């Protein structure tokens, strides 16, 4: 599983002009599911997302996690993160999980997140989404599990 984590001042996801998920300060996370991913992988990634220290402390050092600052968590599925881009001029998506598996694993991640944390929003799996964000920093990390 790959998760592109971005620290944001605010973020929202629209589908067909309708806002389907939004947060204020927090993390926007684009999630790509790979064929070997399952429930255990989702649990491991959620732990990392909630505890990864990307927010500044009183001295400006990245010492605070999402749990520490009580920010929002916006999870958005993005199968293109799992693309193989090593050769050629066109991405190959053979390294991404099939859609049914991707949806199952992503929805499990969302379920675990909502059970563990009060401020969770999502995009819509498989939809053509417009993602709007104010990238804070910018601070962006690619997490893998």
Swiss-Prot record:
Q: Which UniProt keywords apply?
A: Cytoplasm, Hydrolase, RNA-binding, tRNA-binding
Protein's name according to its UniProt entry = D-aminoacyl-tRNA deacylase
- Bilayer-crossing residues are none
Cross-referenced InterPro entries, in alphabetical order? Answer: Daa-tRNA_deacyls_DTD, DTD-like_sf
Q: Which GO terms describe its molecular function?
A: D-tyrosyl-tRNA(Tyr) deacylase activity; Gly-tRNA(Ala) deacylase activity; Ser(Gly)-tRNA(Ala) hydrolase activity; tRNA binding
What function does this protein fulfil?
A: An aminoacyl-tRNA editing enzyme that deacylates mischarged D-aminoacyl-tRNAs. Also deacylates mischarged glycyl-tRNA(Ala), protecting cells against glycine mischarging by AlaRS. Acts via tRNA-based rather than protein-based catalysis; rejects L-amino acids rather than detecting D-amino acids in the active site. By recycling D-aminoacyl-tRNA to D-amino acids and free tRNA molecules, this enzyme counteracts the toxicity associated with the formation of D-aminoacyl-tRNA entities in vivo and helps enforce protein L-homochirality.
> What are the subcellular locations of this protein?
Cytoplasm
SUPFAM superfamilies reported for this sequence: DTD-like
Sequence motif Gly-cisPro motif, important for rejection of L-amino acids, location on chain: 137-138
**UniProt GO BP:** D-amino acid catabolic process
Q: What class of enzyme is it?
A: hydrolase
Protein family (similarity comment): Belongs to the DTD family.
Q: How does it assemble?
A: Homodimer.
Known EC number: 3.1.1.96
Which reaction equations make up its catalytic activity? Answer: glycyl-tRNA(Ala) + H2O = tRNA(Ala) + glycine + H(+); a D-aminoacyl-tRNA + H2O = a tRNA + a D-alpha-amino acid + H(+)
UniProt domain comment: A Gly-cisPro motif from one monomer fits into the active site of the other monomer to allow specific chiral rejection of L-amino acids.
- List the GO terms this entry assigns under cellular component, sorted alphabetically: cytoplasm
């Amino acid at each position: 599983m790959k998760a592109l984590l971005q620290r944001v001042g605010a973020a929202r996801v629209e589908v067909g002009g309708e806002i389907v998920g939004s947060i204020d300060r927090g993390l926007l996370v684009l999630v790509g599911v790979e064929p070997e991913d399952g429930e255990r992988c989702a649990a491991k990634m959620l732990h990392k997302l909630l505890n990864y220290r990307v927010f500044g402390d009183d001295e400006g050092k990245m010492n605070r996690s999402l749990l520490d600052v009580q920010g929002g968590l916006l999870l958005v599925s993005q199968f293109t993160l799992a693309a193989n881009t090593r050769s050629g001029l066109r991405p190959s998506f053979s390294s991404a999980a099939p859609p049914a598996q991707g949806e199952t694993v992503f929805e499990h991640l969302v379920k675990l997140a909502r059970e563990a944390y009060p401020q969770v929003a999502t995009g819509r799996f498989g939809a053509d989404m417009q993602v709007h964000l104010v990238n804070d920093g910018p601070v962006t990390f690619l997490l893998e599990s």
